[in-house]
Amino acid sequence: KRNGCCNCSSKWCRDHSRCCGR
């Protein structure tokens, strides 16, 4: 599920979702 952004600390998030805190 792509909600929009997720934790940049999570490697899985960066590979499946957008990184939050830009």
From Swiss-Prot:
Q: Which residue pairs form cystines in this protein?
A: 5-13, 5-19, 5-20, 6-13, 6-19, 8-19, 8-20
Give expression by tissue.
Answer: Expressed by the venom duct.
| Outcome reported for the amino acid change (mutating residue 12 to Q) | 70-fold decrease in ability to block Nav1.4. Block of Nav1.2 is completely reversible
Q: Please describe, based on the UniProt annotation, the reported consequence of changing residue 14 to A.
A: Decrease in ability to block both Nav1.4 and Nav1.2, and decrease in binding affinity for Nav1.2, Nav1.4, and Nav1.7
Keywords from the UniProt entry: Amidation, Cleavage on pair of basic residues, Disulfide bond, Ion channel impairing toxin, Neurotoxin, Secreted, Toxin, Voltage-gated sodium channel impairing toxin
At which residues is Cysteine amide found? Answer: 20
Give the GO molecular function terms: sodium channel regulator activity; toxin activity
Which residues does the propeptide include?
A: 1-2
Q: Where is this site: Pharmacophore key residue, the side chain functions like a cork in the bottleneck, with the positively charged amine group preventing the penetration of sodium?
A: 11
Q: Where is this region: Pharmacophore key residues?
A: 14-16, 18-19
Q: How is it modified after translation?
A: Toxins with three different disulfide connectivities have been synthesized. The conotoxin mu-KIIIA-P1 shows the connectivity C1-C5, C2-C4, and C3-C6, whereas mu-KIIIA-P2 shows the connectivity C1-C6, C2-C4, and C3-C5. The conotoxin mu-KIIIA-N has the 'native' fold of the mu-conotoxin family (C1-C4, C2-C5, and C3-C6). Mu-KIIIA-P1 and mu-KIIIA-P2 are obtained by both thermodynamic oxidative folding and regioselective synthesis. Mu-KIIIA-P1 is the major oxidative folding product. Mu-KIIIA-N is only obtained by regioselective synthesis.
Please indicate which residues carry the site annotation Pharmacophore key residue.
7, 12
For the keyword Disulfide bond, the answer is: yes
UniProt subunit comment: Monomer.
Family label: Belongs to the conotoxin M superfamily.
Q: What does this protein do?
A: Mu-conotoxin KIIIA-P1: mu-conotoxins block voltage-gated sodium channels (Nav). This toxin potently blocks Nav1.2/SCN2A (IC(50)5-124 nM), Nav1.4/SCN4A (IC(50)=20-90 nM), and Nav1.7/SCN9A (IC(50)=290-413 nM). It moderately blocks Nav1.1/SCN1A, and mNav1.6/SCN8A. It also shows a very low activity on Nav1.3/SCN3A. This toxin binds a microsite within the pore different from the tetrodotoxin binding site 1 (tested on Nav1.2). The block is partial, with a residual current that can be completely blocked by TTX. Mu-conotoxin KIIIA-P2: This toxin potently blocks Nav1.2/SCN2A (Kd=230 nM, IC(50)=1.37 uM) and Nav1.4/SCN4A (Kd=830 nM, IC(50)=2 uM). It also moderately blocks Nav1.7/SCN9A (Kd=1.57 uM, IC(50)=5.4 uM). In addition, this toxin may also inhibit other sodium channels, as does Mu-conotoxin KIIIA-P1.
What is the protein's given name? Mu-conotoxin KIIIB
Q: What species does this protein belong to?
A: Conus kinoshitai (Kinoshita's cone)
